[in-house]
């Protein structure tokens, strides 16, 4: 999926409002995913998955950092996320559907925290962005 100039602008503006909260939002999205889609917990058997867990917060920071990296490289997402794609495809072997589930939870989290900025256009742009990130992360599965 190709991001238009407007999409890129919307994504950068929305992520700019996330600011230093990317890790917290990532952790919240993970918690939403674990609650809404319990089968996703199987990829984290060694984690304490309770609310506020240090392990979920640490992984949420990784998610937030990866998305911040992606926002900074909207014109070269495959290059920016290549190592992460390798990790998830070859070492962790995460089922690709889980990226869609996490994307849904990220959109919900952003909508809750940025209600005035989460317009239909921004929602659509963020959805396209997260879909593109998911596609890049699963590209090495083939």
UniProtKB/Swiss-Prot annotation:
GO BP terms, alphabetized: hydrogen peroxide catabolic process
Native source species: Equus quagga burchellii (Burchell's zebra)
Cellular component, GO annotation: blood microparticle; haptoglobin-hemoglobin complex; hemoglobin complex
Family that this chain belongs to: Belongs to the globin family.
Function: Involved in oxygen transport from the lung to the various peripheral tissues.
Name listed for the protein in its UniProt record: Hemoglobin subunit alpha-1
Keyword Translocase: no
Boundaries of every Globin domain copy: 2-142
Residue ranges of the TM segments: none
Known partners and oligomeric status: Heterotetramer of two alpha chains and two beta chains.
Originating gene: HBA1
Origin: domain of life: Eukaryota
Binding positions (heme b): 88
């Amino acid at each position: 999926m190709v991001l238009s100039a407007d999409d890129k602008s919307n994504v950068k503006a929305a992520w700019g409002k996330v600011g230093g909260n990317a890790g917290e939002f990532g952790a919240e999205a993970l918690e939403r995913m674990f609650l809404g889609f319990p089968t996703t917990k199987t990829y984290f058997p060694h984690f304490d998955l309770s609310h506020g867990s240090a392990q979920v917060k640490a992984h949420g920071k990784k998610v937030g950092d990866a998305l911040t990296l992606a926002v900074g490289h909207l014109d070269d997402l495959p290059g920016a996320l290549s190592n992460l794609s390798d990790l998830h495809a070859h070492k962790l072997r995460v089922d690709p559907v889980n990226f869609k589930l996490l994307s849904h939870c990220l959109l919900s989290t952003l909508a809750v925290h940025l209600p005035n900025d989460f317009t239909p256009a921004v929602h659509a742009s963020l959805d396209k962005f997260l879909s593109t990130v998911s596609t890049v992360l699963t590209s090495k599965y083939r």
